[in-house]
Regions:
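Bacterial N-terminal signal peptides that target proteins for export
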Residues: 2-12
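Short, charged, low-complexity patches
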Residues: 219, 334-346
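Beta-lactam-recognizing serine transpeptidase/beta-lactamase-like catalytic domain environment
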Residues: 52-55, 59-60, 71, 79-96, ...
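Short amphipathic alpha-helical signal-transduction/dimerization elements
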Residues: 227, 275, 343-350, 354
Length: 368
């Protein structure tokens, strides 16, 4: 089994050449078409950045880490989205941007369901890291490549081999369909089906989450568990302190131990590959020592297009786990767009030496 410690440093040189793809040339006709002003119609009125929104309206920020929150707000900009950042080793919420969306019923997970399916398949010995599955007429992939490129056919096969009951068992074990937070009054639990979805069955459920609803809190909690070695914490803010206390009280609360540590190196390899040369490469920070691991999700539901990114950084001493959700009517809304938001957060925090800090930066006594 591949060791996860120091892995990012080793694979960086191997994958670096794949990170940079030369854009296809644009024809003169294409350039002329692009230069024409866009006609604003009802169909396109929700294109990102054409209609500015403030995702922070109504947010209560008393106990948010000010540095993390500022980085997340700046990175999200005017996109109709949400960011949840947590401390992986405690479950402490560091920032929630667009709390209305974060506390909502959630969205289809799209391909962010794939890490859960991968862990289930590894634990059930359906595959190993090196198992090659046929994903095209003459094309085969192993788990790392399938994670990097978010290959639906690969994960459809895993779901079909395991069946609905096994997929459901691991989905619920990892916290889907239940509250991720502790004492978060407005949080919704998302939804996890009691039977295979009518449309596509367990195959589509395993490739992009058909029939499932997840929240940013749930994916941030899951990313934190991947980062810390398999402890699923309740996400929570510090409790309000009593008069005379120096600071509010924070006590980590463990929901369950997942016992997935032996499988995490294989999972991390795929999530690193996604960042280095796959669908999550917009999250890569070339100037940082912390190599983020992540997984994108791109699909649509009845309401809008959906772009997800779950991620964590600094494996040796994990300090940050992220879930980014962006929604909108434009087909530009995709997982790589959410990965770009995470990348800007990582870069901003690195510029402020956040990852060099040994403790959270929030002054809990003042709440600022």
């Amino acid at each position: 089994m591949l060791k996860s410690s120091g892995f990012g440093k080793t694979v960086f040189a191997l994958f670096l050449s794949a990170c940079c793809v030369t854009p296809a040339p644009v024809s003169a006709a294409g350039a002329a078409a692009a230069a024409k002003p866009r006609v604003r119609t009802a169909r396109h009125r929700y294109v990102p950045r054409e209609k500015a929104v403030d995702p922070t309206l109504g947010d209560i920020t008393n106990f948010d880490d000010p540095i993390v929150r500022a980085a997340a707000v700046e990175a999200l900009g005017k996109y109709n989205g949400s960011v949840v950042a947590v401390e992986p080793t405690t479950g402490r919420i560091l920032a929630v941007v667009n709390q209305k969306m974060a506390y909502s019923a959630g969205a289809i997970p799209c391909s962010t369901i794939k890490p859960t399916i991968a862990l289930a398949a590894l634990e059930e010995n359906v595959i190993t890291r090196d198992t090659m599955l046929k994903v095209g007429r003459r094309k085969y992939m192993n788990l790392t490549e399938a994670m990097a490129h978010s290959n639906n056919v690969f994960f459809e096969q895993l779901g079909q081999r395991m069946g609905f009951e096994t997929v459901s068992k691991y989905g619920r074990l990892l916290g889907l369909g239940e509250l991720a937070g502790y004492n978060l009054a407005d949080e919704q639990p998302g939804a996890f089906p009691m039977a295979p979805p009518h449309k596509g069955g367990v195959a589509r459920m395993s490739s992009f989450g058909e029939g499932i609803q997840v929240t940013p809190f749930q994916l941030a909690s899951l990313a934190a568990a991947f980062a810390n070695g398999g402890t699923l914490y309740y996400l929570q803010y510090p409790a309000a302190g009593q008069p005379g206390q120096d600071a509010p009280i924070f006590e980590p609360r463990i929901k369950r131990e997942l016992n997935i540590a032996p499988l995490l190196p294989e999972l991390r390899e795929g999530m690193l590959a996604a960042v280095l040369y796959g669908t999550g490469k917009r999250s890569f920070d070339s100037g940082g020592d912390e190599l983020p691991a992540g997984k994108t999700g791109t699909c649509s539901d009845d309401q809008s297009h959906v772009g997800w990114f779950l991620s964590y950084a600094d494996e040796a001493h994990p300090k940050l786990a992220l879930a980014v959700l962006i929604r909108g009517r434009s087909s530009l809304i995709k997982g790589p767009l959410a990965a770009g938001v995470a990348g800007r957060i990582y870069r901003r925090l690195r510029e402020q030496n956040y990852f060099a800090s040994l403790s959270p930066t929030t002054d809990l006594r003042s709440g600022r």
